[in-house]
Amino acid sequence: MIKQALLSVSDKTGIVEFARELNALGVTLLSTGGTAKLLADSGLPVTEVADYTGFPEMLDGRVKTLHPKVHGGILARRDLPEHMAALAEHDIPTIDLLVVNLYPFQQTVAKDDCTLPDAIENIDIGGPTMLRSAAKNHRDVTVIVDPVDYAVVLDEMRANGNKVGYDTNFRLATKVFAHTAQYDGAITNYLTSLGADKSHQARSAYPQTLNLAFEKVQEMRYGENPHQSAAFYRDLKAVDGALANYVQLQGKELSYNNIADADAAWECVKSFAVTTPACVIIKHANPCGVAVGANALEAYDKAFKTDSTSAFGGIIAFNVELDETAAQAVAKQFVEVLIAPSFSAAARAVFASKQNVRLLEIPLGKGINQYDLKRVGGGLLVQSPDAKNVQPTELRVVTRRHPTPKEMDDLMFAWRVAKFVKSNAIVFCGGGMTLGVGAGQMSRVDSARIASIKAQNAGLTLAGSAVASDAFFPFRDGLDVVVDAGATCVIQPGGSMRDDEVIAAADDRGIAMVLTGTRHFRH
């Protein structure tokens, strides 16, 4: 039974209301510093921990709760007579409920003007110590680290005579250990990112020890293949607009491959301006059709035409609300997952009878993940995300013929798509749509040939098309393939030892070529 609670929080959201309800239930309130003042100013009966222990706060508040009367009251096992006898001998009441959240270390070090002393002073000592004590003794002590749990605890107390069940206490304890682990991980990340001069401004993006925190969203029936087990975890630092923030409106549980392909589709479609409706169709993590249009329907129709065969059973993403008209067109095809920032009520009604179709709603966001991660045997490759979008002013025309305004638009579109195609990538585009995509080949020439064949199979002409290559042409052979297919302009990074030969070949063939200076390998 909860008779006495200790409340000491940095995040004071809802703490007064929570304490008021505890007081109404007859719970004695202990508190520290600013929390105690807030509760007292709110008219609540509260005892300062310094008065409770008979020992004053000291060292500028560094020592407040590190006292046997606090930790003894938390750690004592109520089912062990010797523990309870020790409490009685030393006149230590039990503390049955602990509410603590920690100094805002991560928010502090996120500030540009943070100094090492600022960071050090925001490393909480007493808070984690109390939290770990309470979480260890969770059979007897309820511990709250997150204001979202106030209501749950109050409901159980009201329903059970001030008692909280073991299952709830266990869940709250595991939440505490996850929280303190993340907190210590953030401290380690920061301190090991500092250079020899310990300058906050000169710290490395890649700390000597890297701690990452994820929480499980779901376990899956299987992984990439049926013989593999799998689960999906969400990054606790997931940015706005990340796939992990999806809300599933309908459909079966997402599979491992669904999520992998959905991420590829969403990242690609997000790269287009929201003022330009765009549609991306993904199969096996590669775009098989990408287009922009006057509306969602036009964008979808154009994207689907690129490769209607591969689009079967694909993942489709839009960067604008999916309306009824576009939904009706999409519903005619077999689609695994459909993603959009929002779905109109009429669009949702279209899919109501197709419960196997998974509808994911994800708000568009401008945030960029801190890291791009790739697991290798015994290690982890960590890099910054490939977030660079080349602007037309950054392009360098290297041929005698310059692209026309229409060709430049097509080149920019093709370059945007090529970034999301597995290397080696060759993408034919024209009129705001992909015409042929060659992906994942060991030879750039083969990717060019496949892209040309794809367009031919789809009945799409490549005459006057634009081509993007995710990396440089090492020889002129790949260039000749795309020009023979009908391309009149090419965009590529440049940087080959034979750039001069490739540029000369472009001049020989009478096409325009622009260099980006940026490569978009994707493995």
Swiss-Prot record:
Stored InterPro entries: AICAR_Tfase_dup_dom_sf, Cytidine_deaminase-like, MGS-like_dom, MGS-like_dom_sf, PurH-like
Pathway: Purine metabolism; IMP biosynthesis via de novo pathway; 5-formamido-1-(5-phospho-D-ribosyl)imidazole-4-carboxamide from 5-amino-1-(5-phospho-D-ribosyl)imidazole-4-carboxamide (10-formyl THF route): step 1/1; Purine metabolism; IMP biosynthesis via de novo pathway; IMP from 5-formamido-1-(5-phospho-D-ribosyl)imidazole-4-carboxamide: step 1/1
Protein's GO biological process: 'de novo' IMP biosynthetic process
The keyword Hydrolase appears for this protein: yes
Pfam families per the UniProt record, alphabetical: AICARFT_IMPCHas (PF01808), MGS (PF02142)
Keyword Transferase on entry: yes
EC number, UniProt record: 2.1.2.3, 3.5.4.10
Keywords: Hydrolase, Multifunctional enzyme, Purine biosynthesis, Transferase
Annotated Gene Ontology cellular component terms: cytosol
Domain MGS-like: 1-145
One MF term in the entry's GO annotations: phosphoribosylaminoimidazolecarboxamide formyltransferase activity
Enzymatic reactions: (6R)-10-formyltetrahydrofolate + 5-amino-1-(5-phospho-beta-D-ribosyl)imidazole-4-carboxamide = 5-formamido-1-(5-phospho-D-ribosyl)imidazole-4-carboxamide + (6S)-5,6,7,8-tetrahydrofolate; IMP + H2O = 5-formamido-1-(5-phospho-D-ribosyl)imidazole-4-carboxamide
Top-level lineage group: Bacteria
Gene3D superfamilies, per the entry: 3.40.140.20, Methylglyoxal synthase-like domain
HAMAP family membership: PurH
Family recorded in the similarity comment: Belongs to the PurH family.
PANTHER family to which the protein is assigned, alphabetical: BIFUNCTIONAL PURINE BIOSYNTHESIS PROTEIN ATIC (PTHR11692:SF0), BIFUNCTIONAL PURINE BIOSYNTHESIS PROTEIN PURH (PTHR11692)
Domain notes: The IMP cyclohydrolase activity resides in the N-terminal region.
Protein name: Bifunctional purine biosynthesis protein PurH
Species for this entry: Cupriavidus pinatubonensis (strain JMP 134 / LMG 1197)
Lineage: Bacteria, Pseudomonadati, Pseudomonadota, Betaproteobacteria, Burkholderiales
Gene name per UniProt: purH
